[in-house]
């Protein structure tokens, strides 16, 4: 008797938008649909915060590994064994599962989700295109860009954003200082190092604001320097998604001076609660969400003065702040309801048989070094790398 079709999601065990988006789709899927399994890949040499929230799944598997210390082939065999047998869909979200698919055939139709408008995801899509049956991109820009890179695959490239749940509590009108919020990894790509400069510009305009900064990362120390009043910023570090959701109702403006984004979840969640976004105007999913001047502001990336000017406009005109708050909430409620988007994902999964592409006869593994050989014992490879300090040129993510 043939096994029923099921869906297997493979993704990194990291706290962040990828895991939270997947968890939301799983939470809102139909109860009578196919079984869903999640395989979390956990590099024990990574310092990323693990995803601790529960997922509504029929099976949860964790695959731990230590790259670049281990033999890559041993890690890929371990991952392949964690994928439940049977037909259906394998949803790939990062490089490790695509590498696994290069040498192991799970017998499933493969969907690859590009979680951001970054070269990283586009490069993976192009490199592993023969193994991928369908691509999911989150933004209109991403759909067009990937279609230009892979014009022969345009019909199997789907623009399918993730949604967010409706906010449990809407933002309350503040009476004192404007309440500013930053949510994201503290690195230069997210613009965390620009926050103190924006605050200084606000002070020069006579505006005192209160900041809450959520996140951690390599730019944490730099982000904490240069504040006119260091006590005006509350640093919360990395927090779970549930904790972040509880913060939005107590803030007025979400400030995100990124230089690269996809479809930023923090913007969707904040707007759902009525928090007005002031975010970089990037050629990605930002304009899929924010209507400039109505539901938020889109300063030029890296332009501290424009960010401060937009925030100052809201601080000096609270009626405008309230109107934009309502518009932000309405925009997400109408276009990014997670229930609708979860149903769209289910409809795509249901097409697995018609979208299935036969596996190429010969596929090269694009990662690894001379020590990454299927016939070399993993223990030997780990010992040699520990002694010699040799690092394999595999992906570090």
At which residue positions do the language-model features occur?
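Short His-centered aromatic/hydrophobic patch
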Residues: 91-97, 114
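Donor nucleotide-sugar binding/catalytic pocket of nucleotide-sugar-dependent glycosyltransferases
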Residues: 131-168
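Nucleotide-activated donor-binding/catalytic signature segment of Leloir-type glycosyltransferases, i.e.
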Residues: 223-239
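Short alpha-helical donor nucleotide-sugar binding micro-motif in glycosyltransferases
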Residues: 238-239, 246-251
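Aromatic "clamp/platform" in nucleotide-sugar-dependent glycosyltransferases that forms part
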Residues: 259
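Short hydrophobic beta-strand element within catalytic cores of glycosyltransferases
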Residues: 276-280
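Conserved acidic donor-binding segment of nucleotide-sugar-dependent glycosyltransferases
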Residues: 291-293, 297-304, 313-318
């Amino acid at each position: 008797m043939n096994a029923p079709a099921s869906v297997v999601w493979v993704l990194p065990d990291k706290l962040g938008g990828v895991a939270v988006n997947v968890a939301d789709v799983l939470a809102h899927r139909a109860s009578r649909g196919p079984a869903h399994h999640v395989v979390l890949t956990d590099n024990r040499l990574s310092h990323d915060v693990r995803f601790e929230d529960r997922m509504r799944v029929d099976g949860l598997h964790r695959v731990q590994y230590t790259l670049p210390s281990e033999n890559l082939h041993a890690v890929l065999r371990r991952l392949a064994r964690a994928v439940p047998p049977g037909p259906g869909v394998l949803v790939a979200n990062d490089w490790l599962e695509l590498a696994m698919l290069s040498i192991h055939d799970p017998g499933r139709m493969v969907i690859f989700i590009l979680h951001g408008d970054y070269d990283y995801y586009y490069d993976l899509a192009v490199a592993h295109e023969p193994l991928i049956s369908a691509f999911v991109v989150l933004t209109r820009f991403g759909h067009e860009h990937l279609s230009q890179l892979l014009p022969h695959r345009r019909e199997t490239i789907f623009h399918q954003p993730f949604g967010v749940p409706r906010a449990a509590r809407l933002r309350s009108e503040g009476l004192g200082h404007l309440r500013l919020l930053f949510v994201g990894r503290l690195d230069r790509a997210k613009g965390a190092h620009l926050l103190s400069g924006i605050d200084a510009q606000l002070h020069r305009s006579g505006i005192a604001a209160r900041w809450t900064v959520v996140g951690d990362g390599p730019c944490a120390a730099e982000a904490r320097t240069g504040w006119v009043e260091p006590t005006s910023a509350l640093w919360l570090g990395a927090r779970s998604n549930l904790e972040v959701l509880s913060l939005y109702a107590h803030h007025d403006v979400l400030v995100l001076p990124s230089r690269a984004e996809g479809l930023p979840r923090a913007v969707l969640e904040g707007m759902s609660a009525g928090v007005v976004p002031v975010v970089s105007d990037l050629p990605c999913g930002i304009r899929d969400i924010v209507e400039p001047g109505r539901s938020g502001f889109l300063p030029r990336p890296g332009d501290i003065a424009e960010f401060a000017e937009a925030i100052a406009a809201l601080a000096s005109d609270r009626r405008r702040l309230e109107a934009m708050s309502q518009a932000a909430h309405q925009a997400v409620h109408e276009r990014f309801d997670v229930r609708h988007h979860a149903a769209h994902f289910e409809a795509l999964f249901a097409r697995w048989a018609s979208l299935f592409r036969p596996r190429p006869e010969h596929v090269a593994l694009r990662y690894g070094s001379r020590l990454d050989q299927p016939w070399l014992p993993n223990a030997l490879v780990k010992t040699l790398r520990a002694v010699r300090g040799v690092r394999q040129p595999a992906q570090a993510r």
